[in-house]
């Protein structure tokens, strides 16, 4: 198809969740509170890990990276969504839309790879505890973290460039809460079959490969736990992985449902709700999951609160 006489869009319009003003105001308040809790919760986790020497281990090094990813991911979507909820004209410039797609897609990919890395860390901790400190040394942890960030970013850059080279013509209405990959691809006025195949292949590489590594890790972990004779030992080993396993189910479950089969994807409303849950709630829930289900983190919280209480008491007297 020739594109010489086509008009190219300079901005997109995000249709969002609702056009009712009262609903939009309610959503604004809800998402603002959620975003504040997300930022506060994740930065508190990072601060806690920095302050407590007992948490200076590979597991919490990766958790620090995960918290940074969660805050960044939420920031790539929620502030723009908040602005649009109170705006009469919900436009987003072409460049801003491309940037949002790049950062949200990249940070999502980084999180998937990080979760696989964290699964490997738990595998070594449970299945080979005597050699844990030798295997999971600082150099390896740094390389694994860098690999996560680079792989997610490179995939996102490739997908963003391919997507925004498509001719969008005059079709500028994105029926989504953000510049989401599949929603933007649907705007193209050419056949996008090859793009959808590229999305599926990319999803398999960056989503299913880490997911398979997570599955293999947990098969070995469960097998090792079942061989432990004492009930107390099994409980301790399971609690070592409980927080990570919960986060894995949340993150991978929704992403697989959304991306692996783009042609047989759910309805637009379902896609919006899935994306909303993944981009708004998951970054908020992750620090809560690690705080509630992890004894070491809870112990560090109690120690920090005790120190703060002591300082407050001294200042009061």
UniProtKB/Swiss-Prot annotation:
Pfam families membership: 7tm_4
UniProt-annotated glycosylation sites, renumbered to this chain: 5
Membrane topology: Multi-pass membrane protein
Compartments where found: Cell membrane
Gene Ontology molecular function, alphabetical: G protein-coupled receptor activity; olfactory receptor activity
Membrane-side (Extracellular) residue stretches: 1-25, 80-100, 159-196, 261-272
Spans through the membrane: 26-49, 58-79, 101-120, 140-158, 197-219, 237-260, 273-292
Chief localization: membrane
Keyword vocabulary terms for this entry: Cell membrane, G-protein coupled receptor, Glycoprotein, Membrane, Olfaction, Receptor, Sensory transduction, Transducer, Transmembrane, Transmembrane helix
Membrane side Cytoplasmic: residue ranges: 50-57, 121-139, 220-236, 293-317
Signal peptide feature range: none
Keyword Magnesium applies: no
A cellular component term, taken from the record's GO annotations: plasma membrane
Gene Ontology biological process terms from the UniProt entry: detection of chemical stimulus involved in sensory perception of smell
Top-level taxon: Eukaryota
Function: Putative odorant or sperm cell receptor.
Family per record: Belongs to the G-protein coupled receptor 1 family.
Protein name, UniProt field: Olfactory receptor-like protein OLF3
